Amino acid sequence: MTIVTAIQIYTYSREREEKQMSKKFELTTESIMYFGRTLFRIKALVGFGNVETGELGGYIEKEENLDQSGNAWVSGNACVFGNACVFGNAWVSGNAWVSGDACVFGDACVFDDACVSGNARVSGDACVFGDACVFGDARVSGNARVSGDARVSGDARVSGNACVYGNACVYGDARVSKSTHLFQVGCIGSRHGFTTFYRTKNKRIHVACGCFSGDIDEFEKKVIKNHAGTKHEKTYRAAIELAKAQIEDVEGGE
């Protein structure tokens, strides 16, 4: 072995050791199949945040799914795959999953059986939990909470101290930054379903009710056409008036 070769081997070994030491986690050989992808359980190499050295975490597809810096972590049976990423101080835990090109960061948390997918972003101190789903190009930030069986999608923005819960569906160009930007009622109508009223970026009230999705005025016309003279007309029209009284920061609002 020449001196040059010895130096090269030593340099390579040092670089490899330094690179390994800079990592906070590694992929283990324990794996699962999830949505047709092979995911690997992670293991902490150092202690950070509330994670101890040697602690086993959840499952990711590749190292890029979880940042090696910060206190971000994936725990329990949670899964992160595709081009999704978790970074900052964010946590994904329980049976939650993050996929597609979605990102969870800041001090955000996703847990229980919740999912974040598509090009969605969950950030700040926001939390998504229960069986809730955030997908499409939706953004959930600030101190917002999305829970229950709620769905947030499209170009929707949920922020501030807003809470989207139950069976609420918020999508399209929704702009919900406080609890008075949303109103939900159920079980009403011939199908005993849930109806969600929410504020849009144009400061109008949008309605999501079964297959219907549109402006509140369009919804009222639809109700009159389909349920004229029935108790369902009375119930829906009462809900419409309550929504107009409840939802703030909209055109024609109080």
In which residue ranges do the predicted regions lie?
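Extended, small-residue-rich solenoid/repeat segments and analogous flexible loops
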Residues: R14-C85, N89-W91, N95, G252-G253
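A structural signal for alpha-helix termini and helix-coil/disorder junctions
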Residues: F48, K225, G229, D249-G253
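Mature, structured domains enriched in cysteine- and short glycine motifs
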Residues: S75, T200-N202, C209-G210, K244-E251
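Short, Lys/Arg-enriched N-terminal segments with co-localized hydrophobic residues
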Residues: M1-Q20
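Charged phosphate-binding loop/patch that engages nucleotide di/tri-phosphates or the phosphate backbone
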Residues: H232-E254
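Intrinsic-disorder/low-complexity loop/linker signature
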Residues: I7, G36-R37, N202, C211
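Thr-biased low-complexity repeat/linker tracts and other Thr-enriched repetitive architectures
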Residues: N71-R175
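Glycine-rich hexapeptide-repeat left-handed beta-helix
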Residues: V116, C127, C133-V134, R139, ...
